[in-house]
Amino acid sequence: MSHHWGYGKHNGPEHWHKDFPIANGERQSPVDIDTKAVVQDPALKPLALVYGEATSRRMVNNGHSFNVEYDDSQDKAVLKDGPLTGTYRLVQFHFHWGSSDDQGSEHTVDRKKYAAELHLVHWNTKYGDFGTAAQQPDGLAVVGVFLKVGDANPALQKVLDALDSIKTKGKSTDFPNFDPGSLLPNVLDYWTYPGSLTTPPLLESVTWIVLKEPISVSSQQMLKFRTLNFNAEGEPELLMLANWRPAQPLKNRQVRGFPK
C-alpha cells in the first residue's frame, strides 16, 4: 500500500515518487529561496492573519509529525490578503525538524537550513471543506515560519509540554485555548510561490507564504521534538528524529517577495 511512506532510508522522500508520481511534478515543495532571484511584486499586500477567535481542539501524533487541530467550521481563524484572493481558514499547524540543530527546516534561504519549520495550514473557504480545497490549485495556503536556535520560546513550550501524552502514532490529547498567533514573529514580511504539500499525497494546491523573520527555539526545546515516536504503541520504537523533505527543483516558478 502507498501508506508506508516515511523518512527512513527505505521509505523516505527519495522513494515517494513510486507511490506518488506527482513527487516529480512541476510545482513541488519545499524549495530553496535564492534571495538574489526573488521578484519584488508591487501587487502583493501585507498579510492579514486574523486569529483572535481561534479555537484549538486537540493535538494528534499522526506518525510523521504532530498536528494541533483547530475548529474550522466557521471563520474563526483566517488568513487573507498577502498574495491571496479570498479567505482561508486555519485547520491545523505542525512542525518539521531535524536530528540536529543545523538542519530540519524544509524551505531553505540561500541554502541555509534552520533547526525546524512551523506550518500553519489554511484552506480556501470557497471550496467548502479542506478535502475539496486540497484538490484545487488555489485551495490551500500554508504559512511557513522558521525556528532559529537561540532563546527558549515560551509560547512553543506550551506545545512541547503536551508531547509526553502523544508519544506514539495515533495518540491524541485535548489541547484547548492555544493562540496560534503566539507562534508568529513580530514582522510578517514574506516570500511567496506556488507549491505543494511537503508530505504525501504531495498535492500541488498550496500557495506558500514563507515568513522572512524566524522565531526562536532553544536547543533544549529542540530535544523535546525528537522524543516523539513514528511508531504506534506496542511496535518497535522508532524515534521521530527527523521529518523534513529536502528542497525540490524550482522549475518554471518565481518566488516573489513582500515588501518591495
From Swiss-Prot:
Positions contributing to Zn(2+) binding: H94, H96, H119
UniProt-listed Gene3D superfamilies: Alpha carbonic anhydrase
Known cofactor(s): Zn(2+)
Start and end residues of each Alpha-carbonic anhydrase domain: 3-259
Top enzyme category: lyase
EC number: 4.2.1.1, 4.2.1.69
InterPro entries according to UniProt: CA_dom (IPR001148), CA_dom_sf (IPR036398), Carbonic_anhydrase_a-class (IPR023561), Carbonic_anhydrase_a-class_CS (IPR018338)
Name of the protein in its database record: Carbonic anhydrase 2
Species the sequence originates in: Bos taurus
Gene responsible for this protein: CA2
